[in-house]
Regions:
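Bacterial N-terminal signal peptides that target proteins for export
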Residues: 1-8
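Extracytoplasmic low-complexity repetitive segments enriched in small/polar residues
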Residues: 42, 72-75, 210, 220-224, ...
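C-terminal motif of bacterial Sec signal peptides marking the signal peptidase cleavage site
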Residues: 15-17
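Short alpha-helical patches at coil-to-helix transitions and adjacent helical residues
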Residues: 144-148, 179, 237
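N-terminal capping segments
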Residues: 22-148
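Sec-exported extracytoplasmic/periplasmic mature domains
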Residues: 51-55, 152-160
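Low-complexity, Gly/Ser/Thr/Pro-rich intrinsically disordered linker/tail segments
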Residues: 219-243
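...with weaker cross-activation on analogous glycine-rich loops/strands in unrelated enzymes
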Residues: 157-222
Length: 243
């Protein structure tokens, strides 16, 4: 399976990029645990987001109000001078599903939505106003996925679970060295990343997959150290229904 690897030297920033995910009920309903997933399936799903090839046009760009009056800022490269270098996609061919605040699209749904004639905007980054607005700031006209939405898809969950809820579906591991493919590093209310594989035999650095903001607002694969995760207050977790 082809991987488009991204090695992120600024992992510290990446892990702080999503701020608070849209808030949903904090309890974990029993339905979620009726959807078992294998580790191989979880990673295959993650790669599908990282490697997604899609075509953009200028019509998929918006920095303003959608038809419902919701403010949207797509992470397109033309916005980089105003919104920072993490803005990345351009009209034409792109790789990696863009980050969308409150997003839960599958790769297939994302491509179908972009093919529609009605307004569909490619991504919507986690601005301060999005963080403040929570669920009320989600645009139904933007397409993409956010950090907890990506993990929810990789685990075959029936709906998007927030970073505050995911821990309720898991057992917390005693140590990061126990991480296996499809497990997560979690900071509730802030961000979540998916464990892919170890970089070294010492289990001090691993490849992660996330929907984040550095170096770009998109789904990508990169390396992160356990030392960094511990310093930032992340803990290792395992979904109860992963096999």
């Amino acid at each position: 399976m082809k991987i488009r690897p991204t090695i992120c030297c600024a992992a510290l920033l990446a892990l702080c990029s999503c701020n608070t995910t849209p808030q949903k009920p904090q309890h974990a309903d029993a339905l979620s645990l009726s959807n078992p997933v294998t580790r191989k399936q979880a990673i295959k799903t993650a790669y599908a987001y990282v490697n997604l090839k899609w075509e953009a046009t200028s019509n998929n760009r918006l920095h303003g109000l959608d038809p419902n009056g919701q403010h949207v800022d797509t992470p397109d490269a033309d916005a980089a001078p105003q919104l920072g270098s993490a803005m990345w996609w351009k009209p034409g061919t792109n790789y990696g599903m863009p980050y969308k605040w409150g997003g839960f699209d599958t790769p297939e749904e994302f491509l179908l939505r972009l093919a529609q004639e009605s307004p569909v905007y490619a991504g919507d980054y986690a601005s301060d106003s999005k963080v403040a607005g929570g669920d009320d700031a989600v645009s139904s006209y933007a397409a993409g996925i956010d950090c907890s939405g990506l993990v929810s898809r990789c685990w075959n969950l029936p709906r998007p679970y927030s970073t505050r809820e995911l821990g309720g579906l898991c057992v917390q591991l005693q140590d990061f060295s126990e991480l296996q493919p499809g497990d997560i590093a979690l900071k509730p209310g802030t961000h979540v990343i998916l464990f892919d594989s170890w970089v070294d035999d010492a289990h001090s650095v691993f490849y992660a997959v996330e929907a984040g903001g550095v170096p770009h607002w998109k789904c990508y694969r990169y390396r992160i150290s356990i030392e960094t995760l511990k310093r930032l207050g992340y803990t290792p977790h395992r979904y109860k229904n992963i096999r």
